[in-house]
Amino acid sequence: MEIKHLLFLVAAACLLPVLSMKRKSAKKLFNKLVTDLPNVQQEIVNIHNTLRRGVVPPASNMLKMSWSEEAAQNAKIFSRYCDMTESNPLERRLPNTFCGENRNMTSYPVSWSSVIGVWYSESKYFRYGLWPSTDDDISTDRYTQIVWATSYLIGCAIAPCRHRGSPRYFYVCHYCHEGNDPETKHEPYKKGVPCEACPNNCEDKLCTNPCIYYDEYTDCSLEVRFLGCNHSTPRMFCKATCLCDTEIK
């Protein structure tokens, strides 16, 4: 047997236990990150609410987020595809609304706080009231989705997968209502004194009175003004405008 061949076999024999230990360690970490665990759900919600109440400038209408099991199930289904391409909006719809989406892929299981921190780090490119850069290398969409005022439900999932032959971990969060409206993306919330828009429904700088409905038309105020909420079109497609008077929408 050639000496090079022998050295290769020795090196491989030494490497196999290391790889086995790494796989076991990764599996152990992954099992602590699955979003079926109530403590993981609460961690994700708490991180988001902490970031939302700390926006600069402060927000007057920022809603407190809660966990949605239905949104989490949609995220779980999509996470199994291990695809960084945005999912079909119909695949992340809830009964009353559509949901936005943030995605991340790693080569090793990392904490949810680390993943959410990656998304939030886009805040360094964001200036309230200014339109986002058109530079393809600069994005603020994941940050603005995190701090979108009217998003009040969140559901997330993580899935192990393989990408080009290597192990990967795919993280997905769905935010409902959906954020990143192209018309208002430069102002994801209303600037002002915390809870100014919800003085009777406030909890630690966050509003607790979401409108559970969603306007599917962008010009619902005009639709309602000219047709009224008794008309079939506004009644079906402008539910937030018609049914929510004091709630945050």
From Swiss-Prot:
Functional description taken from the UniProt entry: May have a role in sperm-egg fusion and maturation.
Annotated ShKT domain ranges read 211-244
Q: Name the chain's protein.
A: Cysteine-rich secretory protein 1
Provenance organism? Macaca mulatta (Rhesus macaque)
Q: Which residues cross the membrane?
A: none
Locate the SCP domain: which residues? 45-175
Tissue distribution is:
Expressed in all the regions of the epididymis except the caput and is not detected in the testis, prostate, seminal vesicle, and brain.
Disulfide partners? C195-C202, C198-C207, C211-C244, C220-C238, C229-C242
Write out the similarity annotation.
Belongs to the CRISP family.
Sorted alphabetically, the Gene Ontology BP terms of this entry are: binding of sperm to zona pellucida; sexual reproduction
Q: Name the SMART domains on file.
A: SCP
Which SUPFAM superfamilies does the UniProt record give?
Crisp domain-like (SSF57546), PR-1-like (SSF55797)
- One GO cellular component term: extracellular space
Glycans attached where? N104, N230
Source organism, top-level taxon: Eukaryota
Q: Which keywords fit this entry according to its UniProt record? A: Disulfide bond, Glycoprotein, Signal
Signal peptide limits: 1-20
Cite the InterPro entries for this sequence. Allrgn_V5/Tpx1_CS, CAP_dom, CAP_sf, Crisp-like_dom, CRISP-related, Cysteine_rich_secretory, SCP_CRISP, ShKT_dom
